[in-house]
Amino acid sequence: MSKYLLRRLLILIPVLAGISLILFTILAMAPGDPFEELATNPNVPAEVRMNLRAKFGIDDPIGVRYIRWFSSMMRGDWGFSFASRVNVDTLILQRLPTTLIVLGSAQLLAILVALPIGTMSAVRPYSIFDQIATTLAFIGFSLPTFFTGLLFILLFSVYLDWLPFIYRADISATGWRFYWEHLRQAIMPVAVLGLFQGAALTRFVRSAVLDVIRLDYINTARAKGLSEQVTIAKHAVRNALIPVVTLMALQIPTIFTGAVITEQIFRVPGIGSLLISAILANDTPVIMAITFVFSCVVVTLNLVADMLYGWLDPRISYR
């Protein structure tokens, strides 16, 4: 296990380097100028704009700019935001915890919804419960997150007035009231993301469990006298989770994409809203840093998924 993990970590180095090179090249070739706003300002002389471009190396060759950026990033210097006038790492560290909390809670909700419903649908295929669950699952992952987000706002914020529809970071409450207010305003973005992912995951859990419960070793476990609950939970579901874990790892980029949209709808001060603001302002250092952080998180979580295979199925050996 340790040798396999070390080998995978060493493989991540050229993978992340290649990802950073591709991202940097695409952003460098994309249209837009971070100093375009200064060009329309008559109070900023042309000499000042030229000096700024020379200082930040905007007109240097792409290869030179990439080497400079990558070496600076390895030293912990992620650049300077042209729009916010703040270091990029400071901006990301301010927003990243909020995004990770929302995404982690949404993924946990998706698992808590998908596992029991998908398993019960597989155990009782084509029953009334299975048909209702299948219908709701199809509706859940057919509706985009921006549409369900607007529906949630209309229902729970406008008509019922139960939940705030704008996420506020500057809550003045103290004590338990502070945590309660944060929980209330996080319910809708977490529910929108979690139910969307849970709907798709439910179908895959059902399919995976349905394939496993027809195998011979499940019939053998029943013949030994094990209860149906133990047979399904201990022997069927655990082995059926391997393709589900693979799917969850592959869906991580989709989750981040949904988070970008959801943060815009509910005004969540996370990485997604920061990325949209940086794109609109042509703030290349911030865009590059955020996309690279997303790539690192995706690659790391896929490595974690590979590690989970051995825990789910002890027959899998890491060499």
Locations of regions flagged by a protein language model:
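Hydrophobic alpha-helical segments of integral membrane proteins
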Residues: 9, 52, 62-78, 88, ...
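Residue-level recognition of pore/gate-forming positions within transmembrane alpha-helices
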Residues: 12, 42-43, 138, 154-155, ...
